[in-house]
Amino acid sequence: DFKKFAIINAYLLKSILAKKFSNKIKIKWPNDLLFKKKKICGILQETVNNAGKQFLIVGIGINTNFDPKNSSFSATSLKHITNKNIDNKKLLIMIKKNYEKLLFKANKNSFSELKKFTRKI
């Protein structure tokens, strides 16, 4: 059921960003992450049917190195939080590894690990 992935995606990204950058990052359901009520990440997902198979497409936008003073939206960035330039490649690799760990555990255990994960959320 792909609907659960909205929760999983938000929780996984929040966990990664909170651990690495600030524990003040919070989830705003269903698809945003906020830092002090300012948007730092947006998550979109869509299911697609192709040749009788269903696929999930997930788009993740993380504000990394922009200056929030130049934005007309209530947003912030990881650079603004940390006062450091963010290496986008390293951040992407970190996110990818965390997704791989979660999905490997889920696949290895017939998705029982994923079910446990969603129950914790």
Name each region found by the language model:
Residues D32:
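Conserved active-site carboxylates
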Residues F2-I25, F35-I121:
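Long, positively charged amphipathic alpha-helical accessory segments at protein N-termini or as interdomain linkers
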